Amino acid sequence: MEQQHIEVVGKLGSTYGIRGWLRIYSSTEQAESIFDYQPWFLKIKGEWQSIELENWRYHNHEIIVKLKGVDDREAAQILANVEIGVDLSVFPELEEGDYYWHDLIGCTVVNLEGYTMGTVTEMMETGSNDVLVVKANTKDAFGKQERLIPFLYEQVVKRVDLTTKTIEVDWDAGF
């Protein structure tokens, strides 16, 4: 499977017990939603490899998983801290104005005055709204290295064009 078709949705953590269970860190909105997206791929030595989920459960407010063929602590330790990915085709279509974070990362952000503010390097979730983390251009006229711009569709974010990878915002370049 080619890497550009895989989206990271979580990470395996440390081992749990002696029978091959691992802790898991989900980056989906609801932690257990990670199990809605199958099959999983693990990034092992830079390559995505398919893996089958055998079982999962909550243990002391953490999620632990059992992967098929991982039957002891030693086998599980090899997979500790490995990223979990899924093929992008398993994600449902979104409504107008809704976007997956992976679609926004890498977009160029331009304000209404036409000033290129930088490139979206990551997204952050806050209590009220998502935030674009924008790495400023190296010769930013305002001396900025990074900008945090709220992803408030229509209020701040005026247009998203995924074809040209451009996000137009109503945001002062000095902020």
Curated annotation (Swiss-Prot):
Q: Does the keyword rRNA processing apply?
A: yes
The GO terms describing molecular function are: ribosome binding
**PRC barrel domain residues:** 96-175
| Pfam families the UniProt entry points to | PRC_RimM, RimM
InterPro entries under this entry?
PRC_barrel-like_sf, PRC_RimM, RimM, RimM_N, RimM_N_sf, Transl_B-barrel_sf
Coarse class of the primary localization is cytoplasm
Q: Where is the signal peptide?
A: none
- Superkingdom as given in the UniProt entry: Bacteria
Gene3D superfamilies per the UniProt record, alphabetical: PRC-barrel domain, RimM
Example GO BP? rRNA processing
Question: Which keywords are on file for this protein?
Answer: Chaperone, Cytoplasm, Ribosome biogenesis, rRNA processing
Presence of keyword Chaperone:
yes
Where is it localised? Answer: Cytoplasm
What's the family? Belongs to the RimM family.
* Assembly description: Binds ribosomal protein uS19.
Q: What is known of its domains?
A: The PRC barrel domain binds ribosomal protein uS19.
Question: What function does the entry list?
Answer: An accessory protein needed during the final step in the assembly of 30S ribosomal subunit, possibly for assembly of the head region. Essential for efficient processing of 16S rRNA. May be needed both before and after RbfA during the maturation of 16S rRNA. It has affinity for free ribosomal 30S subunits but not for 70S ribosomes.
Protein name per UniProt: Ribosome maturation factor RimM
